[in-house]
């Protein structure tokens, strides 16, 4: 009997604008329009080329790789305490990050213009691949055990911390990291030595946030593509304080996730798994740390932040109010936040579209409030 996932909605009866394919295509148009606009009006901007190449190759590689994942029986195990509608997703191939993350890294590596840029891209590629492998090991353990849990939280945290410390030691040796945090209106906060624990926290928090966001078809891949695009455009708008090479890297990663989205939109043919979501968070963090874009990442990645905070709040309140019977209060119907709306009766695709729109609005806000000299 086939493990192929069944669509959660009858796409034949849906309005054209509510179909997953249409929503994903419209998101792609927005991202391409942003890259073309940047190239047209910002000096030295070359964002469209890595975006186009990465998107095309990602679509093709995913088309080739999804049947391979299915043949290897890499079917997602759905958590039993999650929304019951998700049980129909059981068997959908996972670990899709293996197919597209390398595409973004390879295309992004071709935008280097000098030796220092090449080494920064190498460091970025290393930390992204390291997190991808950690996520892949976690996914593999889940699949072999037939459960939704792989590595222990402590084990995963230790591996992520070790990888992040190696990256930060590399960046510190090369003097790539500014000890201040750039803010709008020419304001900056001098962090001194504290920039290092902050950078480590960013890696751990951002990768966890993108991982939590990957719970609905197309949610994390769409939001990730938008945030990578926003980071790229703000790097170009910052002129001499920006970084065209890292902007090109961001667009290559945006293209990789946009191409993946064509297969990950509802009804999903493949999931990125921890393999993809942890790599996404690591790449976003690495770019932000190397380019002094922690503030733009905080604003543009607001949906990721909200997803993570919803889990923290839910757990804290439940533990703080737990009575002798072991039952505590819940702020949300279910965490992360996207499940709160889904359990409340909002259609999965509607939740995804609203989160995409929210991310798009936050990206625009981040561009308006970008750091200035």
UniProtKB/Swiss-Prot annotation:
Pathway: Cell wall biogenesis; peptidoglycan biosynthesis. It is found in: Cell inner membrane. One of its GO terms (biological process) is cell wall organization. InterPro entries: Glycosyl_transferase_4, PNAcMuramoyl-5peptid_Trfase, PNAcMuramoyl-5peptid_Trfase_CS. The lineage of its organism: Bacteria, Bacillati, Cyanobacteriota, Cyanophyceae, Synechococcales. PANTHER family: PHOSPHO-N-ACETYLMURAMOYL-PENTAPEPTIDE-TRANSFERASE, PHOSPHO-N-ACETYLMURAMOYL-PENTAPEPTIDE-TRANSFERASE HOMOLOG. Pfam families: Glycos_transf_4, MraY_sig1. It catalyses: UDP-N-acetyl-alpha-D-muramoyl-L-alanyl-gamma-D-glutamyl-meso-2,6-diaminopimeloyl-D-alanyl-D-alanine + di-trans,octa-cis-undecaprenyl phosphate = di-trans,octa-cis-undecaprenyl diphospho-N-acetyl-alpha-D-muramoyl-L-alanyl-D-glutamyl-meso-2,6-diaminopimeloyl-D-alanyl-D-alanine + UMP. Its cofactor is Mg(2+). It is a multi-pass membrane protein. Keywords: Cell cycle, Cell division, Cell inner membrane, Cell membrane, Cell shape, Cell wall biogenesis/degradation, Magnesium, Membrane, Metal-binding, Peptidoglycan synthesis, Transferase, Transmembrane, Transmembrane helix. This is Phospho-N-acetylmuramoyl-pentapeptide-transferase. One of its GO terms (molecular function) is metal ion binding. One of its GO terms (cellular component) is plasma membrane. Its EC number is 2.7.8.13. Catalyzes the initial step of the lipid cycle reactions in the biosynthesis of the cell wall peptidoglycan: transfers peptidoglycan precursor phospho-MurNAc-pentapeptide from UDP-MurNAc-pentapeptide onto the lipid carrier undecaprenyl phosphate, yielding undecaprenyl-pyrophosphoryl-MurNAc-pentapeptide, known as lipid I. It is an enzyme of class 2 (transferase). It comes from the Bacteria. The chain crosses the membrane at residues 16-36, 46-66, 93-113, 120-140, 157-177, 185-205, 216-236, 242-262, 270-290, 298-318, 350-369. Belongs to the glycosyltransferase 4 family. MraY subfamily.
């Amino acid at each position: 009997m086939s493990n192929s996932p069944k669509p959660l909605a009858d796409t034949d009866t849906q309005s054209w604008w509510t179909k997953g394919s249409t929503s994903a295509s419209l998101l792609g148009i927005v991202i391409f329009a942003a890259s073309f606009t940047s190239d047209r009006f910002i000096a030295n901007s070359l964002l469209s080329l890595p975006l186009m190449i990465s998107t095309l190759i990602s679509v093709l590689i995913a088309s080739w790789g999804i049947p391979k994942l299915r043949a290897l029986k890499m079917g997602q195990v759905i958590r039993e305490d999650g929304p019951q509608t998700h049980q129909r997703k059981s068997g959908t191939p996972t670990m899709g990050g293996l197919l597209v993350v390398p595409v973004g890294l390879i295309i992004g590596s071709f935008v280097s213009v000098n030796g220092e840029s090449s080494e920064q891209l190498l460091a970025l590629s290393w930390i992204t691949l390291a997190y991808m492998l950690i996520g892949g090991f976690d996914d593999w353990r889940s699949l072999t055990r037939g459960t939704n849990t792989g590595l222990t939280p402590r084990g995963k945290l230790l591996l992520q911390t070790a990888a992040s410390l190696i990256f930060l030691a590399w960046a510190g040796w090369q003097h790539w990291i500014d000890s201040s945090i750039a803010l709008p209106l020419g304001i900056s906060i001098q962090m001194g030595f504290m920039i290092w624990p902050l950078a480590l926290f960013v890696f751990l928090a951002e990768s966890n946030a993108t991982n939590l966001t990957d719970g609905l078809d197309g949610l994390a891949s769409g939001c990730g593509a938008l945030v990578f695009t926003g980071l790229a455009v703000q790097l170009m708008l910052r002129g001499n304080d920006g970084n065209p090479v890292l902007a090109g890297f961001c667009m290559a990663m945006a293209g990789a996730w946009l191409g993946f989205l064509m297969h990950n939109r509802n009804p999903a043919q493949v999931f990125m798994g921890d393999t993809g979501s942890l790599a996404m968070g690591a790449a976003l963090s690495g770019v932000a740390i190397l380019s002094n874009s922690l503030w733009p990442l905080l604003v543009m990645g607001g949906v990721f932040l909200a997803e993570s905070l919803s889990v923290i709040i839910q757990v804290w309140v439940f533990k703080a109010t737990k009575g002798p019977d072991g039952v505590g209060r819940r702020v949300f119907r279910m965490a992360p936040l996207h499940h709160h709306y889904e359990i409340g009766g909002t259609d999965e695709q509607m939740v995804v579209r609203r989160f995409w729109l929210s991310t798009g609005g936050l990206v625009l806000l981040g561009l308006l409030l970008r750091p200035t000299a």
